[in-house]
A protein has these predicted regions:
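Conserved beta-strand-loop-alpha-helix junction that forms the acyl-donor binding cleft
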Residues: 137-147
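Conserved active-site tyrosine of GNAT-family acetyltransferases
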Residues: 150
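Short, surface-exposed beta-strand segments enriched in small/polar/acidic residues
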Residues: 98, 136-137
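GNAT-family acyltransferases
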Residues: 1-100, 104-108, 121-129, 142, ...
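Glycine-rich acyl-CoA binding loop
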Residues: 113-116
Length: 183
């Protein structure tokens, strides 16, 4: 896999490799530092909402390593080299050209605009990839910060759904054209 990195003024995003996912799941901070060059908050654990899907991501990476950019990305502060969270795609674009994006910050890094900055950059990256026409996210109606991030990056609500675990979920989306116009 090539060394893909996306940079913003304050942040760097890099797709997690199979070895990095293994170290994260094992809680091995020294190995993570060696593999990523990034310091992780203690105790070593995936960012919120990433713990459950990470074993599945590991299996996908084992089968299709070339798809690593379509799964989980580590978000780190460029200046301090600290892990602040994760942004993830739900896999490569579907037949309609849509990809799903999700994001989570470690608690101590919430409220600093990192999620908005990272998600905006990753949406821009996604639209540079062949076949991507739309980026979507799902946010529970009660998760005001997630809704705010979606709106701040130019997404608009397009549907709602019911989730057994979290209740009503809004589906937000942005198209390649709308993303360029909001830049």
């Amino acid at each position: 896999m090539t060394d893909i990195r996306v940079h913003t003024e304050r942040l760097e995003m890099a797709p997690l490799t199979l070895e990095q996912v293994d170290a994260l799941l094992a809680g091995d901070g020294d190995r993570l530092r060696e593999l990523t060059g990034v310091l992780f908050p203690r105790p070593i654990a995936p960012p919120p909402y990433m713990t459950d899907p990470l074993p599945d991501v590991r299996e996908r990476l084992r089968r299709r390593l070339a798809e690593a950019p379509w799964w989980n990305w580590l978000i780190s502060e460029r200046e301090t080299e600290r892990a602040v969270g994760s942004v993830s795609f739900g896999g490569p674009a579907d037949e309609a050209g849509a990809v799903l994006i999700g994001y989570a910050m470690y608690e101590q890094f919430e409220g600093h605009g990192y999620a908005t900055e990272a998600v905006k950059a990753m949406i821009d990256w996604a639209f540079q990839q062949a076949g991507v026409k739309q980026v979507r996210t799902l946010a529970p109606v009660w998760n005001t910060p997630a809704l705010r991030v979606a709106e701040n990056v130019g997404m608009r609500p397009v549907a709602s759904d019911e989730d057994d675990d979290v209740g009503e979920v809004l589906v937000y989306a942005v198209t390649a054209r709308a993303s360029v116009e909001s830049a």
